[in-house]
């Protein structure tokens, strides 16, 4: 069964857009044996097809005109949704200088 990328974005699907990052993650997790859910307020939910116990909630951002604002918004969205200990939570951004700097400036707790 082929994976159908379901979310589309105004800026298109070229790197480093959000659509590119989202599609790349969907393809990766699909190939690793995960069910993909993009139908909720969480950008990407991936659930292991076999065990159903391994779950990822991922917030996705691409290159924007305001990476600082978007990165902090992404962090806030993720933290608000961290409600269960058995879920892996992640942020996915393209590997570009603006996001690398923001990641370096973020405290690790």
Regions found by a protein language model. Give the residues of each.
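Nucleic-acid nuclease catalytic cores
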Residues: 82-109
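Active-site-adjacent loop/helix micro-motif of nuclease/hydrolase catalytic cores
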Residues: 65-75, 99-102
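Short beta-strands and strand-loop turn motifs
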Residues: 6, 58-60, 89-92
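Histidine-anchored nucleotide/phosphate-binding helix
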Residues: 73-83
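Acidic-basic catalytic patches of nuclease active cores, encompassing PD-(D/E)XK
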Residues: 1-42, 49-52
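A general structural motif
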Residues: 53-54, 86
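Conserved catalytic cores of phosphodiester-cleaving nucleases, focusing on short active-site segments
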Residues: 44-46, 54-65, 81
């Amino acid at each position: 069964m082929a994976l159908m990328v379901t979310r589309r974005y105004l800026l298109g699907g070229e790197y480093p857009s959000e659509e590119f990052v989202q599609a790349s993650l969907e393809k990766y997790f699909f190939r690793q044996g995960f069910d993909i859910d993009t139908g909720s307020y969480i950008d990407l939910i991936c659930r292991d097809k076999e065990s159903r116990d391994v779950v990822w909630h991922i917030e996705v951002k691409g290159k924007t005109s305001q990476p600082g604002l978007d990165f902090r918004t992404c962090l806030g969205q993720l933290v608000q949704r961290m409600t269960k200990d058995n879920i892996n939570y992640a942020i996915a951004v393209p590997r570009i200088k603006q996001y690398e700097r923001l990641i370096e400036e973020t405290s690790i707790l």
